[in-house]
Regions:
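Conserved donor-binding/catalytic core segment of Leloir-type glycosyltransferases
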Residues: 163, 208-234, 367
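A short, well-ordered alpha-helix in the C-terminal region of glycosyltransferases
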Residues: 348-351, 355, 362-377, 386-389
Length: 393
């Protein structure tokens, strides 16, 4: 089958897209990828890992209108012409839409009613409520998360298949929209085997932290990720775990606030902000981590999605300490890979860290369970078979 994936972003950037495409190609399908370039000088036709990449120009100014995709129709009309050209030129037989932002453009272009799959990378209507630009004075006037939710429900109903990140997301959509659960396939953003089996290590990173008891945080550091609560807990933990070090690998516009909190709490010697790093550096940090943390705050989005970091932690046998938001709770309890603490509760977080620090046998058990869960159940080569089966129906 000729599958046309639609991504309104440059490529390659998103591992979810490339992982799904690779699985479908290995199953015998032909995958064409519509994507955009912000540069006028670009390679229009490309082949990357057998994915037939077709790039189309989109200025950064016009791309900003994607935030208004369900307020004004400019972006929809502009992108739909390009998508229509892509569909005809490549004789696409099935359209695979990567997230709700571009969905209206695809359906406007789909004049011949080609079968569609809507791939929801996250609960966009809920998470956008926390975006800085949405909460600006102008954003509050122009951008309505409620309109995005209405659009999401509309295109879920119109699509032949829907893909979500977690079982919790599947359950939430099934109840909210009243559609059959068999229409929805779960595909989490987990790791490929090569991530944890074929990698290089940076000795300078390892040497800096090898004598420390490392709490590792990977990923975006925005307020809703809960790092301010963790930093507050360091005030107590540093007196109980002398070689403690919180290592933060990631960044966001909230970093200045986090760094100010570190100074205010006088814990500068116990926190290392590493900044944003390429994924190729992650194995070095994971190899020196004693515990991987995911202290997400509670909201509908976090209840229905997995942070990529939890699978990255697990693949290196790094025990987890996670806030008890629903999706994380399911992973911890099903695979016995770590401990939960009450969301946004620094005392409970501190207590949980200290208990694991004092119990080396439990840490070893969780570490082994992490590796078993990834190798036998949760690596991408296994979970991607759900998408292959969906297309085989």
């Amino acid at each position: 089958m000729k599958i046309g994936m639609i991504l309104d972003a440059p490529f390659p950037t998103d591992p979810r897209v490339s992982n799904e495409a690779s699985a479908l190609i290995n199953a015998g399908h032909e995958v064409f990828l519509f994507c955009i370039s912000f540069k006028k000088d670009f390679k229009r036709n490309d082949i990357l890992n057998s994915i037939k990449v077709k790039r189309y120009y989109c200025s950064k100014l016009l791309y900003k209108f994607s935030a208004l995709a369900y307020t004004f129709p400019f972006y929809k009309y502009f992108m739909s012409r390009k998508i229509s050209h892509f569909v005809k030129e490549n004789e696409i037989e099935h359209l695979h839409i990567h997230d709700i932002q571009i969905a209206s453009s695809v359906y406007h272009a789909n004049k011949t009613n080609i079968p569609t799959t809507l791939d929801l990378h996250e609960n966009r209507p809920e998470i956008m409520k926390f975006y800085k630009h949405v909460n600006s004075n102008l954003g509050k006037i122009l951008i309505s998360p409620q309109k995005w939710k209405i659009a999401e429900e509309k295109y879920i109903k119109l699509s032949d298949n829907v893909i979500v990140v977690t079982k919790a997301a599947k359950d939430e959509i099934s109840k909210r929209i009243n559609i059959e659960s068999k229409k929805i396939t779960v595909y989490p953003n987990t790791v490929k085997k090569q991530f944890y089996k074929n990698h290089d290590l940076n000795n300078s990173i390892i040497n800096r932290f090898k004598s420390k008891f490392v709490l590792l945080y990977l990923g975006n550091t925005s307020k809703r990720r809960g790092l301010d609560m963790v930093i507050n807990s360091i005030v107590t933990l540093k007196n109980l775990i002398p070689n403690l070090m919180l290592v933060v690998v990631g960044s966001s516009s909230y970093d200045d606030s986090l760094k100010s909190l570190v100074i205010k709490n006088k814990v500068k010697d116990f926190v290392s902000f590493e900044g944003w790093k390429n994924e190729t550096e992650f194995p070095s940090y994971l190899s020196i981590a004693n515990i991987g943390i995911s202290p997400l705050t509670s909201n509908i989005h976090h209840d229905t999605t997995y942070a990529n970091k939890i699978f990255q932690y697990m693949s290196f046998g790094c025990p987890l300490i996670c806030s008890d938001v629903l999706a994380q709770k399911e992973i911890i309890e099903e695979y016995k890979v770590g401990e939960l603490f009450k969301t946004e509760n620094s005392n409970d977080f501190s207590k949980t860290v200290l208990e694991l620090y004092k119990n080396s046998e439990k840490l070893k058990t969780y570490s082994l369970n992490c590796k078993i869960a990834i190798e036998n159940h949760l690596n991408n080569e296994i979970v991607s078979q759900q998408i292959v089966s969906m297309y085989a129906k």
